Amino acid sequence: IRDRYYETKKPSKDDLFEMLLPEDVEEIVSLYLQIKKEYLVYTSTNKLNTQTYEFVAVARDGSYRCFPQVKTGGESLNGNKYKHLATNGNKVYLFAVSQNYNNINGENIIGLDKKELLAFVYSHVNLMPERIRLWINE
């Protein structure tokens, strides 16, 4: 039997989210919201209601909450499913790796931009968990 060799190409920076576990993508969104949007995460809310949101975070002044939802693969997110959370000043942050969003208004139901999150990751590599850094440093 002859040895077979296959040429592989190094993944591009733009492919990072496709390589990561869903939990890692959620971690990136959590860090982004805490650092860039200045939210504080209620860690006890992580996985309380996984069907609707990933966790609950609060604005630093306590005036409103945010409810992020993250989908990997080719899944899309529809803002109408989250309208009940986006009341009384509360916000919903949606992130789909596919970037397929419907019914988002940009005010209290917000679709996060993949390129912006990638830029965040690469400018904050030192804050990323080890599993994510392994992919970045490949």
Residue ranges with predicted function:
Residues 1-138:
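Mixed-charge (Asp/Glu-Lys/Arg
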